[in-house]
Amino acid sequence: MSMTPREIVHELNRHIIGQDDAKRAVAIALRNRWRRMQLPAELRAEVTPKNILMIGPTGVGKTEIARRLARLANAPFIKVEATKFTEVGYVGRDVESIIRDLADAAVKMLREQEIQKVKYRAEDAAEERILDALLPAARPAMGFGDEPAREDSNTRQLFRKRLREGQLDDKEIDIEVADNPAGVEIMAPPGMEEMTNQLQNLFSGMSKGKKKTRKLKVADALKMIRDEEAARLVNEEELKARALEAVEQHGIVFIDEIDKIAKRANAGGADVSREGVQRDLLPLIEGCTVNTKLGMVKTDHILFIASGAFHLSKPSDLVPELQGRLPIRVELKALSPNDFERILTEPHASLTEQYRELLKTEGLGIEFAEDGIKRLAEIAWQVNEKTENIGARRLHTLLERLLEEVSFSAADLASEHSDKPIRIDAGYVNSHLGELAEDEDLSRYIL
């Protein structure tokens, strides 16, 4: 990951509108990871990541920033909700399962990368096994010359050509494949995931290496053997060692809804999943060792990004130790009508583009006029102000409502509008949404 903070922000701008402060904070945090890896080993061990706390209303881009960041970093990433966890000793998931899930994510990510690297070798090996099943074993050369061997080679090349062209896809063959019995599914009680994982691994290991002959179509057999050969070519021990390093040095954990575990000043009663969870998170964020399938994972250099709306509580309601472990505070702003307008048009694969392309599959064209987009943005902002502010998610509700009739009758409308697309202008938006937006009671329940 050698992108500069400016390049990271530029990439985030393709998908997320506004929130420049948050983008700069995460870009610097990501670049600092690269900078740390350039340091001498002795100094590198001393440099710890500066964890981030994002504060802002729902639907303004907190989660999306973290999600896009993980894709850019090509790093093990996991998003969890703080409300899913309970204090150790109570029924529910304990916070250490976050690191175990992160380790699983790292293995999955690296395995996919390794399989891509050996893809062509796996395809060649699968092709040879299919040809072995299609053709009898080569006859031993009898008498003088190698005429039969050459004849077999020519036949094999002919079948190889037909196989690659897909002419043999529907032909059935008997092929020996790895025996993968249906996995033993164990419903894990909350907090017992680690034990059930070990039991499942035990049962799956019992049938490892066993083969069985199956009758399959060539196309299905080719895919199955390709996957089997790719898995065989991947060095599992090396993969696990690399995954362990990736988790420890590059892992990113995004903890959403952290405001929901903040103790409110006037709240009473038990705090099984509030203050207790905060105290359990402390060692994880500060740096501790967690036992996982990959071995012992040190969390000292994992980057933690926490986020919350904090509309019923304040960041100061978190326990002081946790506040200290989230030193970088970033406030995300509520969206303005202009932001809504930009969200509808500017991002890569914007909402308007998605609907346009979806309806194009039915042969129906739609065109969003500038005044239509402006009016839609105004309505989204108005409804958010009058009712609950759910940020950019309001646009999904409005667009579904706006295009409901068009989506329902798309196949019928396609023939009527074959030469001219349906134009979504301010008048169209007002006729479909204006009345609902003005009536507060209706908008509260429908929009």
Swiss-Prot record:
UniProt xrefs under Gene3D superfamilies: 1.10.8.60, P-loop containing nucleotide triphosphate hydrolases (3.40.50.300)
Top-rank lineage group of the source organism: Bacteria
The keyword Nucleotide-binding is annotated on this UniProt entry: yes
Binding residues annotated for ATP, in chain numbering: I17, G59, V60, G61, K62, T63, E64, D256, E321, R393
GO BP: protein unfolding; proteolysis involved in protein catabolic process
GO cellular component terms listed in the entry, alphabetical order: HslUV protease complex
Gene Ontology MF term list: ATP binding; ATP hydrolysis activity; peptidase activity; proteasome-activating activity
Localization per Swiss-Prot or TrEMBL: Cytoplasm
Keyword line: ATP-binding, Chaperone, Cytoplasm, Nucleotide-binding, Stress response
InterPro entries named in the record: AAA+_ATPase, ATP-dep_Clp_protease_ClpX, ATPase_AAA_core, Clp_ATPase_C, HslU, P-loop_NTPase
Family: Belongs to the ClpX chaperone family. HslU subfamily.
Function of the molecule: ATPase subunit of a proteasome-like degradation complex; this subunit has chaperone activity. The binding of ATP and its subsequent hydrolysis by HslU are essential for unfolding of protein substrates subsequently hydrolyzed by HslV. HslU recognizes the N-terminal part of its protein substrates and unfolds these before they are guided to HslV for hydrolysis.
Summary of subunit composition and partner proteins: A double ring-shaped homohexamer of HslV is capped on each side by a ring-shaped HslU homohexamer. The assembly of the HslU/HslV complex is dependent on binding of ATP.
Protein name as annotated: ATP-dependent protease ATPase subunit HslU
Organism from which the protein derives: Pseudomonas paraeruginosa (strain DSM 24068 / PA7) (Pseudomonas aeruginosa (strain PA7))
Gene encoding the protein: hslU
